[in-house]
Regions:
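A short, highly charged nucleic-acid-interacting micro-segment common to nuclease
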Residues: 27, 93-110
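Active-site metal-binding core of divalent-cation-utilizing nuclease and nuclease-like domains
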Residues: 69, 102, 114-158, 164-178
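Hydrophobic/basic alpha-helical segments enriched in Actinobacteria
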Residues: 111-113, 117-139, 205, 221-240
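Acidic-and-aromatic substrate-binding clefts and catalytic sites of carbohydrate-active enzymes
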Residues: 45-47, 136-138, 208-209
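A general structural detector for well-ordered alpha-helical segments in enzyme core domains, enriched
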Residues: 56, 175-179, 214
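Non-catalytic C-terminal interaction segments of nucleic acid-processing enzymes
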Residues: 1-6, 11-14, 20-25, 166-174, ...
Length: 279
């Protein structure tokens, strides 16, 4: 039934190439605001043309390709509708992974990724986001995504975790500890094409107080184990204070890609053990 409905919808709305870009982007990020789609799918358009295109999203929603709802004071947020999921499945050969109930969480990640893309574009670099982990991660060890940054001939990978303050500190720590299992399995060497395990960036929307509690919770789990995991902790407010990479000449090229977003960020090299006690 949905396949037949999809054929009717494609004909009725005259599906455009940019519409397809929007659907595939939503499959990747799960949920996005119009401002995110402006950067991710309309960067080649003038402002007026981008505004006109974004008005088309309402038509795609009416056709069942998208779903949308008003999100606080930030306007409409969009995700794939049932018909849109069928279209994506036909294009990529598998159904998109649904992550229901994570609207705030996913929008935090989208905010970060859009900021990363803008920062890299400003200095001639490139930022990419990977979030499909079914083939290489188990359910307990999957990060929220990987930021791949290319600048000055170098590529750096960062595992990214988002914290909206809804989980207990112990839950966050256990999730991060799960990476030790993934590290020991070794598949990451083929995935990243490197013998250097990526550092992890934990972003919290909970403010400075939450950041301090997370830092203490992580430090309480330090053990003398074989797996070194480098962590950077920051807040959404700190990330909003973007410092241009070009103004940080004292940093080497491998560090410049990310540290411009992390002024005054707490950086630790933590060996995360497998203790079970609560933080």
């Amino acid at each position: 039934k949905l396949i037949r409905q999809l054929a009717e919808v494609v004909e009725r709305v005259k599906l455009q190439r940019r519409d397809g870009d929007v659907l595939l982007t939503l499959a990747k990020y799960n949920v996005l605001l119009a401002d995110h789609l402006r950067v991710l799918c309309c960067a080649d358009l003038q402002a007026a043309s981008a505004d006109n295109y974004l008005k088309r999203l309402a038509k795609l929603a009416e056709a069942g390709l998208l779903e949308r709802s008003y999100f606080e004071r930030r306007g409409y947020c969009y995700w794939l509708g049932e018909v849109g999921k069928v279209w994506v499945a036909q294009m990529v050969g598998r159904a998109p992974v649904a992550r229901a109930g994570l609207q705030v969480h996913n929008l935090l990640l989208a905010d970060f990724m859009v900021a990363a893309m803008r920062e890299m574009q400003a200095v001639g670099g490139e930022a990419m986001w990977e979030a499909e982990w079914e083939q290489i991660y188990g359910a307990k060890t999957r990060p929220d995504g990987v930021l791949k940054v290319r600048l000055n001939g170098y590529e750096t990978n960062w595992l990214v975790e988002a914290d909206t303050g809804k989980e207990t500190l112990a839950q966050v720590v256990r999730k991060l500890q799960g990476q030790e299992t993934y590290y020991k399995r070794g598949e990451w060497r083929d995935w990243f094409g490197s013998d250097y395990y990526p550092s992890t960036l934990l972003i919290t929307s909970g403010g400075e107080g939450r950041l301090l509690h997370l830092k203490r919770a992580l430090e309480s789990k330090i053990e003398s184990v074989e797996v070194p995991v480098n962590w950077a902790l920051t807040t959404t407010a700190r990330l909003a204070k973007v410092t241009n990479i070009a103004n940080r000449p004292e940093l080497g090229p491998l560090q410049q890609e990310i540290w411009s977003w992390l002024d005054d960020t707490e950086l630790s090299s933590l060996n995360l053990g497998s203790q079970d006690e609560e933080s």
